[in-house]
Design a protein with these regions (language model features):
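Short beta->alpha transition motifs characteristic of CBS
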Residues: 36-43
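Short beta-strand scaffold segments in enzyme catalytic cores
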Residues: 24-33
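Helix-adjacent hinge/juxtasegments
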Residues: 47-88
Length: 151
């Protein structure tokens, strides 16, 4: 863990809250000791519930290095990632997550992260399979493409 890198994530969060962009969430993506991506919560300014600090930092890092893979990178974030951000971190191939506040801290100031974690196992009633055969045809078509890039 590097204090300087966490301080940079905190600066990102401050930038966001001081400019009215969203909540107190900032993040930096780091590879080989160098910051390759920065982001802060932009939910309010973009009117987009997916613009969390971690997701914004991942998007920035991917643009900066020209790849959707962030393998070998770490992320420093001001709060424990919500399930959506955790999914993005895993999809990006990020190795380690260093965070400041946890889900209980976020809940205390009005954010619902803990609720999402607590209800993940109860979502089966909302996951309703439909038209699987047609979707499997799409998968087969994609799988036979010579220029496909698995990720």
């Amino acid at each position: 863990m590097d204090k300087y890198l966490m301080d940079e994530a905190i600066k990102e969060a401050l930038n966001g809250i001081e400019n009215g962009h969203g909540g107190p969430f900032g993040a930096v993506v780091v590879r080989d000791g160098k910051i390759i991506g920065r982001g802060h919560n932009r939910v309010i300014i973009n009117q987009d519930p997916t613009c969390h600090g971690e997701v914004e930092a991942i998007r920035d890092a991917c643009r900066n290095i020209g790849s959707f893979s962030l393998e070998g990178a770490d992320i420093y974030t001001t709060s424990e990632p919500c399930p959506m951000c955790l999914g993005a971190v895993l999809w990006a191939g990020i190795s380690n997550i260093y965070y400041g506040c946890d889900r209980d801290d976020a809940q205390r100031i009005g954010f619902r992260d803990k609720v999402f974690y607590d209800t993940m196992d109860k979502l089966s009633y909302r996951l309703i399979p439909t038209q699987r055969e047609q979707c499997l045809d799409l998968f087969s078509r994609y799988q036979t493409m010579p220029d496909r890039k698995p990720y």
